Amino acid sequence: MADIQTERAYQKQPTIFQNKKRVLLGETGKEKLPRYYKNIGLGFKTPKEAIEGTYIDKKCPFTGNVSIRGRILSGVVTKMKMQRTIVIRRDYLHYIRKYNRFEKRHKNMSVHLSPCFRDVHIGDIVTVGECRPLSKTVRFNVLKVTKAAGTKKQFQKF
């Protein structure tokens, strides 16, 4: 528990009461605090790290105060330079009526990445769900990570 206290404010889950009276029971070593987590539904499993981990993230869909509603999208991870936020790229085709053909287009999205997803790298495919606005540019949360299969450069349509 001491390793997560790196911020100036005390890090704790707001739904867990930590000040249980231990005078009558006697101090029996360091007990592990209970952890709040939830099943977000929609067929997504709660990661093992969210249940057993010690991180505190109020914007996590599994352990925080964020509900997933609205759109479910997928994209490819392109940048990981922010703290707990990644940039994903969504490719799509746009029809040009004059030439009766399609052109490639893409959009970049900033997405909140919970600490329960540890092994995420550039090129992985992530499934994201819409939530309330978490910051100026972040409106989606990572729900599932799929490892990149091959290193073949190609246009991927989601």
Swiss-Prot record:
Entry keyword set: Acetylation, Citrullination, Cytoplasm, Lipoprotein, Methylation, Nucleus, Palmitate, Phosphoprotein, Ribonucleoprotein, Ribosomal protein, RNA-binding, rRNA-binding
Subcellular location(s) of the protein: Cytoplasm; Nucleus, Nucleolus
Residues found modified as Citrulline: R22
Post-translational modification N-acetylalanine, affected residues: A2
InterPro entries named among the record's database cross-references: NA-bd_OB-fold, Ribosomal_uS17, Ribosomal_uS17_arc/euk, Ribosomal_uS17_CS, Ribosomal_uS17_N
GO molecular function, a single term: structural constituent of ribosome
Claim: Protease is one of the keywords in the record: no
Residues anchoring lipid (S-palmitoyl cysteine): C60
Gene Ontology CC, one term: cytosolic small ribosomal subunit
Omega-N-methylarginine carried by residues: R69
N6-acetyllysine, modified sites: K38, K45, K58
Quaternary organization: Component of the small ribosomal subunit. Part of the small subunit (SSU) processome, composed of more than 70 proteins and the RNA chaperone small nucleolar RNA (snoRNA) U3.
Family classification: Belongs to the universal ribosomal protein uS17 family.
NCBIfam families in alphabetical order: PRK08572.1, uS17_arch
Name the UniProt record assigns to this protein: Small ribosomal subunit protein uS17
Annotated source species: Canis lupus familiaris
